[in-house]
């Protein structure tokens, strides 16, 4: 593997790649656990792990900024960090029921930040390593399918 690509540290790109794929798989497991258990308790626990992934994402973001990598490299981790702060607040610190009944003022920004972070963290790998990007595309598809199944079962 390379030491750097397009002025960005390769280790930071691999870190973000690991974060985005871990988020996809953890959230997919969370959706599927709701179907199996009929509860969101497992999903709630997995959310803490997703939140912890903001730490390596922020370390990678700082490396991208310090190496003067293009905005596309650091934007995904930055949006993910904003999502994690928002998630921690509405799901853990001051819990708000916004999924059911739907509270659009919370749900829309929550979903935009979440899926925006997934897109923006995955996008740079398209240029850097197509094989790794395909892994991200596959885990994202798995996330979307598991979300669709959870919606179909009324537990999303």
Where are these regions (language model features)?
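Small-residue-rich transmembrane alpha-helices that serve as helix-helix interface/gating elements
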Residues: 131-147
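C-terminal ends of transmembrane helices
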Residues: 28-41, 88-97, 148-155
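Membrane-helix boundary elements
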Residues: 40-74
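N-terminal signal-anchor/start-transfer transmembrane helix
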Residues: 10-38, 143
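Small-residue-rich segments of transmembrane alpha-helices in multi-pass membrane proteins
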Residues: 48-60, 103-119
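Structural signature of hydrophobic alpha-helical transmembrane segments
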Residues: 11-24, 71-82, 137
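Membrane-helix boundary connector in multi-pass membrane proteins
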Residues: 92-105, 116-135, 152
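Short, strongly hydrophobic alpha-helical membrane anchors
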Residues: 1-12
């Amino acid at each position: 593997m390379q030491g750097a690509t397009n002025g960005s540290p390769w280790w930071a790109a691999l870190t973000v790649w690991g974060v985005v794929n871990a988020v996809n798989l953890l959230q997919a497991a969370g959706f599927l656990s709701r179907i199996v258990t009929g509860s969101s308790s497992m999903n709630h626990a997995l959310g803490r792990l997703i939140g912890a992934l903001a730490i390596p994402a922020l370390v990678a973001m700082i490396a991208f900024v310090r190496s003067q990598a293009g905005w596309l490299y650091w934007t995904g981790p930055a949006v993910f960090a904003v999502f994690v702060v928002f998630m921690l607040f509405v799901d853990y610190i001051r819990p708000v029921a916004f999924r059911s009944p739907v509270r659009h003022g919370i749900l829309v920004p929550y979903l935009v930040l979440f899926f925006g972070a997934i897109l923006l963290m995955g996008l740079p790998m398209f240029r850097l390593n197509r094989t790794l990007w395909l892994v991200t595309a596959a885990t994202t598809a798995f996330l979307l399918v598991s979300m669709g199944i959870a919606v179909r079962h009324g537990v999303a």
